[in-house]
Amino acid sequence: MEQQIYLFGLNHKTAGVEVREAFALGERPKLGELLVDGEARVREALVLSTCNRVEVLVVDPVGRDPKAAVLAAWAGQCGQDPALLAPHLYAHQGMAAVDHLFCVASGLDSLVLGEPQILGQLKAAYRHAVASRTAGVIINRLCHKAFSVAKKVRTATGIGASAVSISYAAVELAKRIFGEMAGKKAMLVGAGEMAELAAMHLLTSGVSEILVANRTYARAEELAGRFKGRAVAFEEFVSRLHEVDIVISSTGAPHVVIRAKDVRAVLKARRHKPMFFIDIAVPRDIDPDINSLDNVYLYDIDDLQEVVEENLAQRREEAARARDIIGLQVERFGEWVKSLDVKPTIVDLLDVGASLARQELQKTLRRLGPEVPEETRAALETMALSISRKMLHEPIAFLKRRAKEEHGERFVDLTRRMYNLDREKVPTDAHADRKPPNFAETSDDFDVTDASE
């Protein structure tokens, strides 16, 4: 049965941070397993959940529309009403879904154009889908192709030439607030990948010291050691806030970790010297009410857009070149998908050819009598099957070429009728139920799943 690729998602373009918080699924979402094993019963599923997007990739038979089932399961996992999700959702299917995924993997759909973090996040989502056994033939091939396309884009264009990321944008915004960064102190709350990037950019910008707080103290020590900073016990970081000018928080906690009342006390201890807070976590780490305090500047992910726009100019030209690369690779992946439709016909054709060869061989052996040596019988069988294979070579090569065209299904249908491949198969002799050699595995000519670069 022909399969279709569907992609449903929301991102920073379609939904504000509040909506993304409500429908975030975490790093190891169970939604994929629920979609495959639950009521939806889709064939394959992969879920990508980051600060700026949640996307659900599914494979299901053509003719079935899994959208309602996906929305219901997704909203149910978050304890939300599907009606709240629908207005912010985008949906793609077929090659439009493939094109979107390739753009995401290449960083063309990111808040910061060309940022490389999303590729690592997609790889993690794929590993989770494989471990959960929700990735099948199509998602396996699609993800590996996406990884390959992202590599091509990064090496063939200059889209990733400069160090631009959410963390970089956060540091750029801090430089706008304070001007000179020399002598400023910063604290990172959370020690994940985003914090690591922030530490690198902070150090480059000239801050004098970096404090790192994390629930796992060993990880805080590790990150602090790499950037000549100091580790802080997570339970103590609030009491140390008065020491720093800049706070970048990215814990991934399900609740606020920096409260407005704590910041009021910190400001008093600092004699109301300005403080700059960047909240790059979803759900948010920092109480939005602190924005009402004097001498406090609070920005979340959505506020970074203005800074990000200034870093896009040099990448937009490269993005056009990247689109050309992606367009070609989408076309090639489409050819591979079409080859899946023709594969059963090729297998049936090879089966019929091998069956006829064996039937004629049996007639010949009966005429020759029982005295024919087994070695001769084996040689005759090899010859008969080889002739069958060679006779079918050109028809199969023709069918593979034509199947990739716009109306390729017509050639598949014509071949099935021409060779009567849909007739009821009835064994005609003792050898009729023997499995024929798998020519598709023994010859590149019959590699019906080829989708080479």
From Swiss-Prot:
The keyword NADP applies. Keywords: NADP, Oxidoreductase, Porphyrin biosynthesis. Residues 442-453 have a biased composition (Acidic residues). One of its GO terms (biological process) is protoporphyrinogen IX biosynthetic process from glutamate. It comes from Solidesulfovibrio magneticus (strain ATCC 700980 / DSM 13731 / RS-1). The active site is at residue 51. NADP(+) binds at residues 190-195. InterPro entries: 4pyrrol_synth_GluRdtase, 4pyrrol_synth_GluRdtase_dimer, 4pyrrol_synth_GluRdtase_N, GluRdtase_CS, GluRdtase_dimer_dom_sf, GluRdtase_N_sf, NAD(P)-bd_dom_sf, Shikm_DH/Glu-tRNA_Rdtase. Its EC number is 1.2.1.70. It catalyses: (S)-4-amino-5-oxopentanoate + tRNA(Glu) + NADP(+) = L-glutamyl-tRNA(Glu) + NADPH + H(+). Pathway: Porphyrin-containing compound metabolism; protoporphyrin-IX biosynthesis; 5-aminolevulinate from L-glutamyl-tRNA(Glu): step 1/2. Catalyzes the NADPH-dependent reduction of glutamyl-tRNA(Glu) to glutamate 1-semialdehyde (GSA). The record marks 100 as: Important for activity. The gene is hemA. During catalysis, the active site Cys acts as a nucleophile attacking the alpha-carbonyl group of tRNA-bound glutamate with the formation of a thioester intermediate between enzyme and glutamate, and the concomitant release of tRNA(Glu). The thioester intermediate is finally reduced by direct hydride transfer from NADPH, to form the product GSA. This is Glutamyl-tRNA reductase. Coiled coil: none annotated. Belongs to the glutamyl-tRNA reductase family. It holds the Pfam family Shikimate_DH. Residues 423-453 are annotated as: Disordered.
